[in-house]
């Protein structure tokens, strides 16, 4: 009889723009080869979905576009969307799992899902598997908080994070398993997005918010140092107009475009450009880098241990805060013949191979 695994993410199905909900969906799909899997979500997104009502973070973020609502919510908490999702899902997901027992819980939505899983473990001794996607962001602040739930197995993305975990929780079981990429969806073959830009085209993907860690302004500054290079920005957020004005000022109206597309069309966007970059301050998840490489694109990224491991020989890492160095790295990347190196690098992160490693962990719990 197959083990029953409950994968938890309320936002899955409601939004496809975030890395954690996409991973929850992909993990549910691929773990179903080995186990009886249920994906607990607020909206139907796969044949494995069990729809349980709550207020997912995406719905709160939409409400926050109203300045009055945003002001009211952020007066009391820095991340109201995650808090509201966590509270409302705790009230509905916990009773469900009390009556629909599983053998392993696998929360994917930060402390909200961990709280649900902790109650179920307390009642029924059900082990918890958790993937720490924040890594060393904010000097490990999120990681330290989530360690208080003491998951039966914690999955991290690199050796540095594993060593940090053991420095503060020596008894914690930790496994290193990379995040996956859908190689069937992201590949060089297929339709291309018609962006109409001239010359070599550099792509960046991310939320357009001056307050986040993506640092899109650094890309704009770097491209402004180069001739015959255009910038395609794929994303949405509260500061679209700000970045549009900055691009117009730095690049001119003919050398950039800001577009918003459905997730299903993202592969077409990757195929339409010559290289990819994201100069984020920290990027423990790394989904967009993997998608870009799987699409055949070389990558320019921030120089840190995670991205050196992730990108390998499929691109260039540099000090992106040094605009001259960043611009030179982009120029080198666009003038280099990369052949199949990016695709070969991405092949190590197929969801099939990642799911097999997770399956081995689940069988051991």
Q: Language-model segments: which ranges?
A:
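Nucleotide-activated donor-binding/catalytic signature segment of Leloir-type glycosyltransferases, i.e.
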Residues: 244-261
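Conserved acidic donor-binding segment of nucleotide-sugar-dependent glycosyltransferases
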Residues: 313-323, 331-336
């Amino acid at each position: 009889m197959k083990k029953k695994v409950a994968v938890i993410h309320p936002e899955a199905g409601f939004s496809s723009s975030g890395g954690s909900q996409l991973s929850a969906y992909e993990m549910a799909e691929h773990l179903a080869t080995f186990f009886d899997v249920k994906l607990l979500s607020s909206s139907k997104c796969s044949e494995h979905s069990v729809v349980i009502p709550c207020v997912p973070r995406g719905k709160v973020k939409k409400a926050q576009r109203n300045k009055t609502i945003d002001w009211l919510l952020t007066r009391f908490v820095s991340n109201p969307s995650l808090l509201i999702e966590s509270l409302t899902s705790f009230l509905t997901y916990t009773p469900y799992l009390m009556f629909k027992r599983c053998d392993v819980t696998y929360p994917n939505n930060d402390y909200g899902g961990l709280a649900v899983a902790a109650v179920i473990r307390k009642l029924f001794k059900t082990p918890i598997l958790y993937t720490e996607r924040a890594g060393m962001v904010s000097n490990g602040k999120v990681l330290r908080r989530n360690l208080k739930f003491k998951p039966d197995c914690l999955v991290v993305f690199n050796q540095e994070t594993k060593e940090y975990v053991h420095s503060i929780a020596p008894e914690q079981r930790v496994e290193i398993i990379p995040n996956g990429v859908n190689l069937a969806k992201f590949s060089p073959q297929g339709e291309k997005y018609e962006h109409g830009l001239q010359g070599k085209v550099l792509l960046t993907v991310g939320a357009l918010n001056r307050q986040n860690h993506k640092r899109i302004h650094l890309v704009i500054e770097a491209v402004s140092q180069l001739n015959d290079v255009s910038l395609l920005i794929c994303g949405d957020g509260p500061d679209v107009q700000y970045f549009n004005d900055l691009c117009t000022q730095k690049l001119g109206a003919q050398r950039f475009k800001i577009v918003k597309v459905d997730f299903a069309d993202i592969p077409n966007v990757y195929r339409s450009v010559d290289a990819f970059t994201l100069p984020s301050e920290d990027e423990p998840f790394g989904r967009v880098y993997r998608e870009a490489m799987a699409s055949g694109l070389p990558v320019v990224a921030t120089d840190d241990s995670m991205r050196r491991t992730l990108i390998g020989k499929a691109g260039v890492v540099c000090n992106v805060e040094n605009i001259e160095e960043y611009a030179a790295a982009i120029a080198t990347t666009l003038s280099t013949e990369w052949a199949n190196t990016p695709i070969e690098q991405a092949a190590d992160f197929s969801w099939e191979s990642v799911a097999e490693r997770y399956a081995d962990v689940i069988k051991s719990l």
